[in-house]
Amino acid sequence: MGKPLYLVKFIIIGSQSVGKSCLLFRFIDNKFKSQSTHTIGVDFSSRVVDIQGKNVKLQIWDTAGQERFRSVVISYYRGSAGVALVYDVTNRESYNHITNWLSDVKSLASPDVTIILVGNKADLTEQREVTFLEASRIAQENGLLFMETSALTGEGVEEMFLKCTRTIMTKIDSGEVNLEHLGVQISSDSGNVTKKPGDSSNCSC
């Protein structure tokens, strides 16, 4: 039997045009999506990563930032183990909306969810409107992980997803979180369902 495969749901949220789809495309294909269009509702991609010797399949949901899709997006908070809350470092308004997005996460997602605040477009230094220091401060005040990224150059993108996933897996290993509440599932790499740690019942994958 191969190593267990952890199935972890991850969502990307944030205002329109902050680069959510470009971050996902960079992480999945290691390319910059120069002709990116606005996400209609929700888009989906997945990738298997190695975290501390464990195979983890990230099921990543890229959500629309427009208000008219809000009712569609909110259902995807449930069962998410990780949330990337993205703002544009060159757009103060997108940063100011962070508190609204955080309010949605706290009211709709599991209390065990891991949130990483992501300042995208960090390569545009001359157009920057939000400093690293002020964003790191708000992350610390709200108990969030924090990184700056550039989907264009790839800087920080891989590490952003891996950092959040490592935190999730550390919580799982330590027994801090309820796997069922987070929607985390475990199967063998052959597709056979295995038991959750400390659980006598099987999970359905």
From Swiss-Prot:
One of its GO terms (molecular function) is GTPase activity. This is Ras-related protein Rab-4. It is found in: Cell membrane. Its main location: membrane. Gene3D superfamilies: P-loop containing nucleotide triphosphate hydrolases. Belongs to the small GTPase superfamily. Rab family. It comes from Dictyostelium discoideum (Social amoeba). The keyword Amino-acid biosynthesis does not apply. Protein transport. Probably involved in vesicular traffic. The modification Cysteine methyl ester is found at C205. PANTHER family: DRAB11-RELATED. It is a lipid-anchor. InterPro entries: P-loop_NTPase, Rab4, Rab_GTPases_membrane_traffic, Small_GTP-bd, Small_GTPase.
